């Protein structure tokens, strides 16, 4: 099976998003809809051949089920790690529909399900995807927490920009610092449907002190912006990198779930490892 991207100016508008959907309950890998990352990266002056970051998109799936060889349902949670250097991202509704197609499909064991998903998702993304499935019968654990850093949200600021405004970003005089700043106020909208997407965003860096009030205004400026989760994080990373010129930088966002999935993009200059999979309270 070969999955290819649709050759139109913006394939996101040909995706299942915002369209009436017939749900399939038998295995259907053709439901996966890849979208080239380069389409939006070009707006930022980024090329796939010379990425300024490393990272991944960590997906958590909370509504996974299939049948065992005797027809008895199995339920599980799953994580899917999509590398940031994959040629394509996977459109989220198509991902949900694909996972739903396992509901009435029979597999001998969980390893067979994992291998099938890894094969299909890797073909769609154009790079190897790491799949981890945990049946609920094994009592998988999850943790909820907040970053070890400084919350920006109590700053008493005035906001009047609701489209991304890189000019709001600036550094302050002084010695270099290394710190983690975070906010729960990131809100953007789906590129296709306009539905609101809510997230916590975490910025870790080393360099000249970033003006915190300006950073929070910048985060708020995404409020009416239409873009996929992964693209928003890359835009934030790129704008901070250009405007503030930190020595090292990492940007991580944890978006609330939709359709049984949440997406948690992470981008870094390579000096900071991806954080563990601790949920934000709204997840």
Swiss-Prot record:
Catalytic activity field: 7-aminomethyl-7-carbaguanine + 2 NADP(+) = 7-cyano-7-deazaguanine + 2 NADPH + 3 H(+)
Residues that, per the record, bind NADPH: 92-93, 258-259
Catalytic residues identified in the record: 190 (thioimide intermediate), 197 (proton donor)
UniProt KW Membrane keyword: no
EC number(s) recorded for this UniProt protein: 1.7.1.13
Protein's GO biological process: queuosine biosynthetic process; tRNA modification
Major localization class: cytoplasm
Pathway in which the depicted protein is active: tRNA modification; tRNA-queuosine biosynthesis
Amino acids binding substrate: 90-92, 229-230
Subcellular location: Cytoplasm
Gene Ontology annotations for the cellular component aspect, listed alphabetically: cytoplasm
InterPro entries (alphabetical): GTP-CH-I_C/QueF (IPR043133), NADPH_dep_7-cyano-7-deazaG_red (IPR050084), QueF (IPR029500), QueF_N (IPR029139), QueF_type2 (IPR016428)
Keyword Isomerase in annotation: no
Keywords: Cytoplasm, NADP, Oxidoreductase, Queuosine biosynthesis
A Pfam family this chain is assigned to: QueF_N
Molecular function as annotated in GO: preQ1 synthase activity
Annotated transmembrane regions: none
Oligomer status and interactors: Homodimer.
HAMAP family per the UniProt record, alphabetical: QueF_type2
NCBIfam families tied to this protein: QueF
Similarity-based family: Belongs to the GTP cyclohydrolase I family. QueF type 2 subfamily.
Protein name as annotated: NADPH-dependent 7-cyano-7-deazaguanine reductase
Organism the protein comes from: Dechloromonas aromatica (strain RCB)
């Amino acid at each position: 099976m070969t999955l290819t991207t649709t050759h139109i100016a913006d394939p996101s508008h040909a995706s299942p998003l915002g369209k009436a959907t017939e749900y399939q309950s038998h295995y259907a890998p053709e439901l996966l809809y890849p979208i080239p990352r380069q389409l939006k990266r070009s707006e930022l002056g980024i090329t796939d051949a010379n990425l300024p970051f490393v990272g991944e998109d960590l997906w958590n799936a909370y509504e996974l089920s299939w049948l065992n060889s005797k027809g008895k349902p199995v339920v599980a949670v799953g994580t899917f790690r999509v590398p940031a250097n994959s040629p394509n991202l996977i459109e989220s509704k198509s991902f949900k529909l694909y996972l739903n197609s396992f509901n009435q499909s029979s597999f001998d064991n969980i390893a067979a399900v994992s291998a099938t998903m890894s094969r299909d998702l890797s073909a769609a993304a154009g790079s190897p995807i790491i799949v981890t499935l945990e049946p609920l019968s094994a009592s998988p654990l999850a943790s909820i927490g907040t970053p070890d850093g400084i919350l920006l949200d109590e700053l008493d600021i005035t906001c009047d920009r609701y489209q991304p405004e890189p000019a709001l970003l600036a550094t302050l005089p002084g010695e270099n610092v290394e710190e983690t700043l975070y906010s729960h106020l990131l809100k953007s909208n789906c590129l296709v449907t306009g539905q609101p997407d809510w997230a916590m965003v975490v910025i870790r860096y080393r360099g000249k002190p970033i003006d915190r009030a300006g950073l929070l205004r910048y985060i708020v400026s995404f409020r009416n912006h239409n873009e996929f989760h992964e693209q928003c994080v890359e835009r934030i990373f790129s704008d901070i990198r250009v405007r503030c010129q930190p020595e090292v930088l990492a940007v991580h966002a944890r978006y609330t779930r939709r359709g049984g999935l949440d997406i948690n993009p992470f981008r870094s200059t390579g000096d900071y490892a991806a954080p563990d999979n601790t949920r934000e309270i709204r997840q």
